[in-house]
């Protein structure tokens, strides 16, 4: 796949990849905006616009925020973003997956297939389908799990507490 080809020419630490049924574009755009404030050369690529492979062929040294669809994930073998974000998983594109939700879930979960213990998976802890998929894959997921929630408190990750955003990462708390 185009994502796979581009990844061959970058360091995984340069890559933040975002997937999910809904919210990919918004999340990718906001992530790009935040990262670009510190690293102005960051590119927003993938399903949202410019090809990741084309961008890499022009300058492989930049950080990349990549919006990745299930279709793109189906073609990966070695793609391993340093940070993977899954916004949610709801029934969509099932015609491509023999109308089997489990096959669609497996496609989305491929984003973490090649991650290591040094990588991160940020995910929506309020999405029961996604939480179940992660629970069912814990023996295969090597990355550090960073949940976010607007409905419950989380020990590690981001949540709302008394109406305020609280982030707990690596024994540090940010409010």
Where are these regions (language model features)?
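Phosphate-binding loop of NTP-binding sites
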Residues: 2-125, 129-143, 159-160, 167-169
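Active-site glycine/GP-rich loop and adjacent strand/helix microenvironment
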Residues: 150-153
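Short, surface-exposed linear segments at secondary-structure transitions and domain or protein termini
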Residues: 155-157
């Amino acid at each position: 796949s185009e994502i796979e080809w581009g990844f061959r020419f970058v360091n995984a630490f340069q890559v933040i990849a975002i997937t999910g049924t809904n919210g990919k574009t918004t999340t990718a755009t906001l992530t790009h905006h935040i990262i670009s404030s510190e690293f102005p050369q960051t590119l927003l690529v993938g399903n949202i616009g410019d090809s990741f492979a084309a961008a890499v062929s022009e300058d492989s040294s930049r950080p990349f925020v990549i919006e990745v669809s299930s279709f793109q994930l189906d073609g990966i073998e070695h793609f391993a973003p340093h940070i993977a974000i899954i916004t949610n998983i709801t029934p969509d594109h099932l015609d491509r997956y023999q109308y089997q939700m489990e096959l669609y879930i497996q496609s989305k979960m491929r984003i973490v297939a090649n991650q290591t213990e040094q990588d991160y998976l940020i995910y929506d802890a309020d999405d029961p389908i996604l939480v179940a998929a992660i629970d069912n894959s814990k023996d295969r997921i090597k990355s550090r799990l960073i949940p976010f929630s607007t409905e419950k408190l989380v020990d590690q990750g981001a949540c709302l507490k008394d109406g305020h955003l609280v982030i707990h990462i690596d024994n540090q708390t940010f409010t």
